[in-house]
Amino acid sequence: MRITAVDVTVVNVPLSVPFSSSVGTRVTTTRTVVRIKTDEGLEGIGETFRGRPTAHIIQTLSPEIIGVDPLNIESLLYKFKMVPFFYGYVGFAALAGIEMACWDLLGKASNQPLAVLLGGYVRREIAVSALVFKKPEHCGMQGKELARALAGDGKALVESQKVKVLKLKGSHDPEQDVLNMEALEEALQGTVKLRVDPNAAWTVADTLRMLPRLQKLNMDYLEDPVEGLDALARIRQEAHMPLATNMSVVKPDDVPAAFRLGAVDVILADVHKWGGISPTRKLAATCEFLGLSMSMHSGSELGISTAAHLHVAAATRIIDHAMDTTLTLQESDIIDEPLHDVRGGVLPVPGGPGLGVTINEEKLRYHAAQNERDGDAA
């Protein structure tokens, strides 16, 4: 089998509600869709992030991909191992989109789901968390009023999706964030595990001041309160709860450094930010060897990427925390199979060959036109 064409499409898909965090507010998701065609008539699909810059890198690499056997995934990754060195995160994103499409091709060629190719199923359904964040209707609220409103949102999510874990998107105001967490705990009477993710917007001093209150709650983990492994290690010395990160462990040599410092307990993996499914599995093996835990980060994936994360979680034993997903916030998608319907706190792993999902051509064209008109979302 040989690659004959590499097509790249950038899409904008609106969110059903503006999504706010300490980083800012988004109303649209921009994603990059990769389609790899072969001389045997099979097509593999992939998805990644960073829109047009990522698409440009993939298009630049495409001439070197034509004629390559897409089933030799490890060789392909080695061929382009310097891409992240020159392009950073966007380079990882480009490789991830290409590699994901190759895994999809391998599954279709062998008529096997991706999870089987990764070693088989550890689990058939993946526990997911639900996201609580400040919405437009909360504008002007603060203090206990905002905390009560967010607690109401969290309770509604638990009742509708039956999730066992809630994640609060934090802010630059740790006092308000912890007040919100306490309101969630009270509303749910400790029946649901909680996470808070300020995206490193807190200071070390603020975090240390908030720890005694957070430690009274049913915490799943505290995610990226501060930036950098040294700062996280300082927090970890005082924290009687797991610390998680996707912002301070971003490349392979960060993992042993985090281990030596005792900085974190849970590494949040992301196939797009680690350069593909194979590198993510290598990360899992490293974490397991070092005694670290692991879960899956969410960065506004659509259905193709969500399917990839579900398969990775299905085949990776060490992933022992509920997976984050923002697919439930999307107004639409670009695949035929609806993956966003969380029931019983879980998402099923797609069962077809490869990723187990198919592109809806009409939706792809529609959302590509939105990107052509508006450009990449911020």
What are these regions (language model features)?
Residues 36-110:
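Metal- or metallocofactor-binding catalytic centers and their adjacent structured scaffolds
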Residues 56, 68, 212, 218, ...:
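Shared catalytic-loop signature of beta/alpha-barrel
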Residues 3, 34, 41, 61, ...:
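Conserved, mostly hydrophobic/aromatic
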Residues 44, 126-130, 164-168, 194-198, ...:
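Hydrophobic faces of well-ordered beta-strands that scaffold small-molecule active sites
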Residues 1-45, 328-334:
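Structured beta-strand/loop patches that form or line metal/cofactor-binding pockets in enzymes
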Residues 119-239:
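Metal-dependent enolase-superfamily TIM-barrel catalytic cores that perform enediolate-based chemistry
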Residues 55-62, 95, 99, 103-104, ...:
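Predominant activation on well-ordered alpha-helical scaffold segments within soluble catalytic domains
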Residues 329-378:
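C-terminal extensions of enzymes
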